[in-house]
Regions:
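Conserved PLP-anchoring active-site segment centered on the Schiff-base-forming lysine
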Residues: 76-92
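Active-site-proximal loop->helix
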Residues: 93-106, 111, 119-124
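N-terminal "arm"/small-domain region of PLP-dependent enzymes with the aminotransferase-like
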Residues: 1-33
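General beta-strand structural signal in soluble alpha/beta enzymes
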Residues: 7-9, 58-61, 84, 107-108, ...
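Active-site phosphate-binding strand-loop segment of PLP-dependent enzymes
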Residues: 116-170
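Conserved N-terminal alpha-helix of the aminotransferase class I/II PLP-enzyme fold
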Residues: 23-70, 89, 93-99
């Protein structure tokens, strides 16, 4: 590759020809019949990534909203209360989905781009002594606004309140 130096810096940088050729191959659709075979090959590697010998990684052939729906409908029932903060487009969409599925969504409206309001979550969870809240929702990385929420802080709020609610993280 005369005249092309490959520097491994954030960019911009030249891309090797073999990588460029690989980029022109069509992607396999995540709903195609071939997709399950591709994912089976990844399972041992995923166990390594997630540092588990006994856990089973799940790969959903859907968009992220399909994963939300699977998690919510398989663990909660219509009428169950969930705690959720609205601070960007994806947290807003998750709240809308939960509402359509018949959940009682306790919404904490925040300025978009601020992330999960830890102190408000902690206060609400401590006040919920009857444990009516069955799940707490948190968008880790709110793509639309570019904010990352402190998920460990949400877990800590649940633990400090000795609250049994499930923690759902997108």
């Amino acid at each position: 590759m005369a005249g092309r130096n490959f520097l491994f810096v954030p960019g911009p940088t030249n891309v090797p020809d073999r990588v460029l050729r690989a980029m022109v191959v069509s992607m396999e659709d995540h709903r195609s019949p071939k997709f399950p075979a591709l994912t089976n090959e990844m399972m041992p590697g995923l166990k390594k990534v997630f540092r588990t010998e006994h856990g089973t990684p799940f790969i959903f052939p859907s968009s992220g909203t399909g994963c939300w729906e699977a998690a919510v409908t398989n663990t909660l029932s219509p009428g169950d209360r969930v705690l959720a903060a609205r601070f960007g487009q994806f947290s807003h969409l998750w709240i809308e989905m939960c509402t359509r599925l018949g959940l009682d969504v306790q919404i904490v409206d925040c300025e978009w781009g601020t992330g999960v309001p830890l102190q408000q979550y902690a206060d609400i969870l401590k006040a919920d002594t009857g444990h009516k809240i069955k799940a707490v929702l948190a968008c880790h990385n709110e793509t639309a606004t570019g904010v990352t929420s402190d998920i460990a802080g949400v877990r800590e709020a649940l633990d400090e309140a000795k609250h049994p609610a499930l923690l759902f993280v997108d």
